[in-house]
Amino acid sequence: MEYITLNNGVKMPTEGIGTFLLTPDEAESAVVSALHSGATLIDTANAYVNEKAVGRAMKASGLQREEIFLETKLWPSFYKDADAIDKTLARLDTDYIDLLLIHQPAGDYVAGYRQMEKAYKEGKVRAIGLSNFNIKQMEKIFSICEVQPTVLQTEVHPYNQEPELKAYLKAHGMVIQAWYPLGHADKALLN
């Protein structure tokens, strides 16, 4: 397994399993299989409605929590909910999240980011980041943040390489993480 060190010193696996569009039963089965196959990064989100299943899968895997890199995302409707992160921890049945992202730059995402900073300072979250943000939106976060974001998760694949965005992230000490890294499973790309 390869790792990358984030700007706060946390080591993140470079590969893992995402649970987008998986039903809870599918997510639980897929995560257990992935963990048994050596994958250690699990990506989920409030909006995927399968966080409880991911939590069950982590327990069923037999792995220690420290062996798993758990990543989830805070949905915009929860940005102002003072206990949103505690509710996320409860759904996942865990004491901490390795990487928590703002899912989208919608609504009051600054309030959401502030909540994540608080959770980071309290030790509930090991790293915080962003998802689906453009450069202008990230600049707004950089102008207010006390804790620098570590990761931007966004659509990146051979058909959408984002060289300007990658250069911006590198200059700011952030890592890019791809969703749909195989281009939506495009047959021409895969073959």
Model-derived segments and spans:
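Glycine/small-residue-rich loop that forms an oxyanion/phosphate-binding "nest" at active or ligand-binding sites
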Residues: 72-118
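Beta/alpha (TIM)-barrel catalytic core signal, keyed to glycine-rich beta->alpha loops juxtaposed to Asp/Glu
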Residues: 104-191
